[in-house]
């Protein structure tokens, strides 16, 4: 944004349907940017070496983000899924932050622009990164995975959303599974998987799996103990682990596997159980997701997700 250029920053002239970032490059340099990457030479000022001319600014940004990610030793966790990506990402990041310096996607900036923008925020002090990746057409998760190069991954679920972009439910599964395809080829990779979800288990062959769910012998397992209105559950590690009870501020049983995912990843990266429970109990949804709000007459209103364009009712996810 040319209106927000800290001294020494880099301006990249992205284009949209109603704007051309090249037209703002001069203003960005005058506002404090050290350099401006443009892809239309007529916007450069002759003799000013602060302009960097490239073929395509967006592609350059994506390549730069991948290069930057490779220079740092940060372990990267990639997350995708039809629903629950953002809440699960927030829960995972909250838990991991109890013991790590974590970079994570802000809001749901999970597309071809948001993902590289997040990666470019990586700093040497970050030892973990949680990167959310979204898709509305085949090949998009493959493309984003090649930018992110995650070391670990999680697919929250697969459901019948954005079918117009994927063509069919099978297309959704295949596209979300592109994260698994990338990790299957990466040496030393790990996949955190909801063992109760048959769709995910069916496409997880050949992966190093860390499972969570309701079965007693899983890496992390648990059961719901209450949901009126806030989700309460028990969990333990393995068959003989110590059992814990957690009272969350989350609405909806559908958040149970999201919480188990955060516990699983937290334990995998060495967060103490007490710290995990403290983080989950203290987490309050912020993005108009699974929130209980009061009206002026003090009655409760349950907000599922005000990003209406991605809401979908998916009984098949619940039943599997």
Residue ranges and their predicted role:
Residues 42-47, 154-302, 318:
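Acidic, Mg2+-coordinating active-site environments of NTP-dependent enzymes
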Residues 51-53, 76, 102-104, 209-211, ...:
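Conserved beta-strand scaffold positions in the cores of enzyme catalytic domains, especially
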Residues 16-19, 286, 305-320:
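Active-site beta-alpha connecting loops in nucleotide-dependent enzymes
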Residues 1-63, 251, 271:
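N-terminal leader/targeting and accessory segments in enzymes
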Residues 12-15, 105-106, 131, 248-249, ...:
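Thr-Gly-centered strand-to-loop micro-motif
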Residues 8, 38, 131, 193, ...:
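Active-site flanking residues adjacent to catalytic metal/cofactor-binding acidic residues
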Residues 17-20, 43, 84, 110, ...:
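Glycine-/small-residue-rich active-site loops that bind phosphorylated ligands and cofactors
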């Amino acid at each position: 944004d040319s209106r927000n250029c800290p001294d020494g920053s880099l301006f990249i002239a992205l284009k949209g349907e109603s704007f051309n970032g090249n037209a703002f490059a001069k203003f960005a340099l005058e506002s404090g940017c050290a350099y401006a990457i443009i892809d239309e030479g007529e916007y450069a000022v002759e003799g000013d070496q602060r302009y960097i001319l490239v073929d395509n600014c967006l592609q350059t940004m994506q390549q730069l983000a991948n290069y930057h990610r490779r220079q740092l030793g940060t372990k990267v966790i990639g997350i995708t899924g039809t629903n629950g990506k953002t809440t699960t990402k927030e829960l995972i990041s909250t838990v991991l932050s109890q013991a790590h310096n974590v970079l994570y996607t802000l809001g749901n900036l999970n597309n071809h622009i948001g993902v590289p923008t997040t990666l470019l925020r990586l700093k040497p002090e970050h030892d973990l990164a949680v990167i959310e990746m979204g898709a509305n057409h085949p090949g998009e998760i493959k493309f984003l995975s090649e930018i992110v190069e995650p070391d670990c991954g999680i697919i929250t679920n697969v459901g019948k959303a954005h079918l117009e972009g994927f063509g069919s439910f099978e297309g959704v599964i295949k596209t979300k599974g592109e994260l698994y395809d990338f990790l299957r080829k990466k040496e030393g990779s790990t996949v955190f998987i909801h063992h109760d979800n048959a769709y995910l288990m069916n496409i997880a062959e050949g992966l190093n799996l860390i499972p969570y769910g309701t079965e007693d012998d899983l890496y992390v397992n648990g059961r719901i103990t209450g949901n009126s209105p806030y989700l309460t559950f028990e969990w333990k590690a393995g068959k003989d682990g110590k059992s814990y009870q957690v009272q969350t501020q989350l609405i909806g049983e559908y958040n149970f596997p999201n919480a188990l995912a955060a516990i699983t990843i937290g334990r995998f990266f060495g967060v103490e159980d007490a710290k995990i429970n403290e983080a989950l109990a203290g987490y309050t949804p912020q993005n108009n997701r699974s929130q209980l709000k009061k009206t002026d007459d003090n009655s409760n209103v349950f907000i599922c997700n005000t990003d209406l364009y991605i809401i979908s009712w998916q009984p098949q996810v619940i039943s599997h």
